[in-house]
Design a protein with these regions (language model features):
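Transmembrane beta-strands of outer-membrane beta-barrel proteins
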Residues: 20, 24-26, 67, 122-124, ...
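Outer membrane beta-barrel
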Residues: 15-140
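Transmembrane beta-strands of outer-membrane beta-barrel pores
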Residues: 1, 30-34, 62-64, 73-75, ...
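Detector for outer-membrane/organellar transmembrane beta-barrel domains
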Residues: 215-314
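Aromatic- and glycine-enriched pocket-lining scaffold segments that form the walls
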Residues: 102-185
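Extracellular loop and loop/strand-boundary signature of outer-membrane beta-barrel proteins
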Residues: 1, 40-46, 95-99, 148-153, ...
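Residues that define the transmembrane beta-barrel architecture of outer-membrane proteins
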Residues: 2-8, 49-54, 105-109, 159-163, ...
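Residues on the lipid-exposed face of transmembrane beta-strands in outer-membrane beta-barrel proteins
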Residues: 10-16, 55-60, 111-115, 165-169, ...
Length: 314
């Protein structure tokens, strides 16, 4: 696979306060893929384009309350782009390049209620139709040729719901938040079809998330910190048919502790630099493993992200 190198993108947003206390908002994006881009090659060396609607919601505000219904995202955590708490929205893994994280998050059908109190705020959500990470796009760095086709989760009339709430308090130069949620792993676990041919079988997993986040402003510097405890996450959710082996455990649930921290530094009114470091570890990671079995991630694992931004708009 190759990094994309020849594409054109357009993002758009529409917002209309059509009545007192009412707001309609929609956003979307269009991508065109030209010669030498991997999407162009994956399309048989032909021009290709795609479009999608991101946000599409109606908001009602009254007194100290705000209620939004429609396709939207809910973002938790202070560490921009690399937070252990930013797991509510499913993602489209496509490119290695640095993009706005909003381009990777996929919106879902939600009801979001916000309460703005005098000393603290509450925010709660209900995801009415939880979705899962789509399979990698053919030709992209995250794509591999699977033994069996990956399909969407077969709900068969099953009702899936995600819920969560957050309490936030602001001080003179800092904020703190506590949060709790019942979620489904964004990444499904896939199993071989029982017949040995056809489509892979997607398996879901639900878990509980408890979190804490804080930030502190010091002049032009903003320090941030996130902490997450996840109960009953899958130890290995990236075992795909044809890539896993007997040495890999199946359907093994674990508790996980994770933290992310970093800073954002405003160089001036147009330029900024940010750093985010993420680290996670499974609790009692060897418990439940058979002799010879091992996890894809053992010990402490994580990632880091550095960003430089220059806003050229006046």
């Amino acid at each position: 696979a190759e990094i994309e190198n020849n594409r054109l993108g357009i993002n758009f947003r529409f917002q209309n306060s059509f009545a007192p206390g009412w707001l309609f908002q929609a956003s979307g994006q269009t991508r065109a893929f030209w010669k030498d881009d991997y999407e162009y090659k994956a399309n048989g060396n032909n021009f290709d384009a795609e479009s999608r609607i991101n946000e599409l919601f109606v908001q009602r505000s009254f007194d100290q309350h705000s209620i939004k219904f429609g396709r939207q995202t809910v973002v938790w955590g202070e560490t921009v782009g690399n937070s252990v708490l930013d797991v509510i929205n499913h993602f489209e893994f496509r490119d290695f390049t640095i993009i706005d994280i909003e381009d990777a998050r996929l919106n879902q059908w939600m009801v979001v209620w916000d309460y703005f109190g005098e000393e603290s705020n509450w925010s709660s959500f209900i995801n009415l139709y939880p979705e899962f990470n789509p399979a990698g796009v053919r030709g992209s760095p995250f794509f591999f040729e699977p033994t069996f086709n990956f399909t969407d989760y077969q709900r068969d009339g099953e009702v899936l719901v995600e819920v969560g709430t957050q309490w936030k308090k602001s001080f003179d130069l800092s904020d703190i938040s506590f949060m709790a949620a019942y979620l489904y792993d964004n990444q499904m676990r896939f199993e071989d079809p029982l017949s040995g041919f056809g489509d892979a079988i997607g398996k879901k997993n639900d878990f509980i998330l408890l979190g804490f986040s804080a930030n502190r402003a010091i002049g032009r510097l903003l320090l941030n910190f996130d902490l997450a405890f996840s109960h009953d996450v899958l130890a290995d959710s990236f075992n795909f048919p044809g890539t896993s082996a007997l040495a890999s455990p199946l359907n093994l649930k674990k508790d996980r502790i994770g933290t992310s921290f970093g800073f954002e530094w405003a160089i001036d009114n147009e330029q900024s630099v940010s750093l985010g470091i993420q680290a996670q570890q499974l609790i009692d990671e060897r418990e439940g493993l058979l002799p010879g079995q091992q996890l894809v991630y053992e010990g402490v694992y994580g990632s880091w992200l550095v960003r430089y931004a220059n806003n050229l708009l006046n």
